[in-house]
Amino acid sequence: MDLKNSVAIVTGGNGGLGQRICHALASEGANIAVVYAQSAKEADAVAHELTGHGVEAAPFACDVTQSAQVARLVDEVTKKFGRIDILINDAAYNKSIPFDDLDRMTVEEWSKIIDVNLTGPFHCIKAVAPVMKKQGRGRIVNIASVAGLGPSGSSIAYAVSKAGLIHLTKCMAVALAPHVLVNCVAPGLLEGTRATANLSNAQIERSASGALLKRAADKDDCADQVVTFCRADTTTGVTVAIDAGRSFH
C-alpha cells in the first residue's frame, strides 16, 4: 500500500516509540493522528514536529480503555482527515512486579494492565474496522513485546497482555480479511526507551551479547518494521520479534 496521503492513527503517539513510529510513517507521506491519554502539551509538540515532513498532523485525546472515547476518536479523525488507512496500537501500561510476588499483583493492577494493553487495542480495532472495510483497504499494526512470546518481562500481567495481543492479531487478521491486514511487532529491549533508561551500559551490553546479532535493537528498527507492515499487500496475521534474534537463541 502506498502510504502517501494515507491517514494513520497512532495510539501512544506521544511516547518514545510512538513518536518514532509517527515520524517513520510521516516520512512516507502519511498524515498522522497523534493519540494520547495524558500530556497534551507533548502530543501537540509531536504533531507540530511531524508537519516538518510535509504532512498534516494533529493531537487527539483518548483513553483507549473506554469504548465511547475510542468511538469518538474515530469519528473526529474521520471528520478531520476524511479517512483512516492505518491504525497503530502502541498505547501501553506496565508496572514492574516480579513474577513470584503474587501478593503485589493485585486484581486492580492486573485489570489496569490488561485493559490498556489488550482491551484497548480491541476497542480501537473494532472502531476502525467499519471505516477500513468501507474504504476497501486498511492496515493495523499492534505493538506487543517479546514478553508475549514466552514467560518473561516485568510482570505476569504484562506478559499475558502481550501474549493476548499477539493472538488478537491472528484472530483479527481472520475477521477482517481480505482487505484489512493485521500484523504485530514484538520488540525486545530497545535502546533509547523508558525500559532501558535505568539500565547501565554494561547491563544493555550484557543483554545484547545474548542476541544472535550481538547488538540491541532500537526504536528505528521497530518503526521500520511497522512501516514495512503498512506497505505490505500480502502479509497478515504475522508477528515479528524486534530483538536482534535474542528471543529464540
Q: What is the role of each PLM region?
A:
Residues I125, S161, T169:
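Active-site helix of classical SDR
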Residues S145:
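Residue(s) in the substrate-gating loop at a strand-loop-helix junction
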Residues D2, I125, R137, A177, ...:
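C-terminal substrate-recognition "lid" of short-chain dehydrogenase/reductases
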Residues A40-K41, A61-L73, V107, D220-D221:
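The beta1-alpha1 cofactor-binding region of Rossmann-like NAD(H)/NADP(H)-dependent oxidoreductases
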Residues P98-L102, T106-S111, I140, T196, ...:
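Substrate-binding pocket helix/loop in short-chain dehydrogenase/reductase
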Residues P130, A173-P178:
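Alpha-helical segment proximal to the catalytic Tyr-Lys
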